[in-house]
Curated annotation (Swiss-Prot):
Gene expressing this chain: rplE
The protein's name in its UniProt record: Large ribosomal subunit protein uL5
Gene Ontology molecular function terms on file: rRNA binding; structural constituent of ribosome; tRNA binding
A GO biological-process term: translation
HAMAP family for the chain: Ribosomal_uL5_B
GO CC annotations, alphabetized: ribonucleoprotein complex; ribosome
InterPro entries linked to this entry: Ribosomal_uL5, Ribosomal_uL5_bac-type, Ribosomal_uL5_C, Ribosomal_uL5_CS, Ribosomal_uL5_dom_sf, Ribosomal_uL5_N
Organism per entry: Pseudomonas putida (strain W619)
Length: 179
């Protein structure tokens, strides 16, 4: 079992149940999935960009990403319907907890000028989104082998009913919020 999953079951869930005054263990908020998305506008001019992004996300997550395509043409962005414009991965269960553990323990401390995560990046329903400016903060990515620095979006979907519940859950996981 993943280290963070065990910590959640044995320490975080009972503490949150008491803190949020919940009557049932199933009411305790938990992380259901983590979605990583890489929007690649530069893929319009160069098709190799998609291959490099797929390889990077696969190294980071240990799971093969899905290529996303434009739903409709937008002349202003020089995009045609059906063109590949990004890659995404959805992590659940064990892989999700393993990734979360690596993100908190290894990757976030490697961010340059890191002052903590914004505690206001919740969506109103307890889900948290954050952006990473460069993929080299992950130890799986070899700096010498990358073609360009690319950012990615990380979204944590939780069963929390409000932002306060979601914030309490992520604080229990020791998320480094700055405010």
């Amino acid at each position: 079992m993943a280290r963070l999953k065990e910590i959640y079951r044995n320490e975080i869930a009972p503490k949150l149940k008491e803190e949020l005054k919940l009557s049932n263990v199933m009411e305790v908020p938990r992380v259901t999935k983590i979605t990583l998305n890489m929007g690649l506008g530069e893929a319009i001019g160069d098709k190799k960009v998609i291959e490099h992004a797929v390889a990077d996300l696969e190294k980071i997550t240990g799971q093969k990403p899905v290529v996303t395509f434009a739903r409709k043409s937008i002349a202003g962005f020089k995009v045609r319907e059906g063109w590949p414009i990004g890659v995404k991965v959805t992590l659940r269960r064990e892989k999700m907890y393993e990734f979360l553990d690596r993100l908190l323990a290894i990757s976030l401390p490697r961010v340059r000028d890191f002052r903590g995560l914004n505690a206001k990046s919740f969506d109103g329903r307890g889900n948290y989104s954050m952006g990473v400016k460069e993929q080299i903060i992950f130890p799986e990515i070899d700096y010498d082998k990358i073609d360009a620095l690319r950012g990615l979006d990380i979204t944590l979907t939780t069963t929390a009913r409000s932002d306060d519940e979601g914030r309490a859950l992520l604080r229990a996981f020791k998320f480094p919020f700055r405010n």
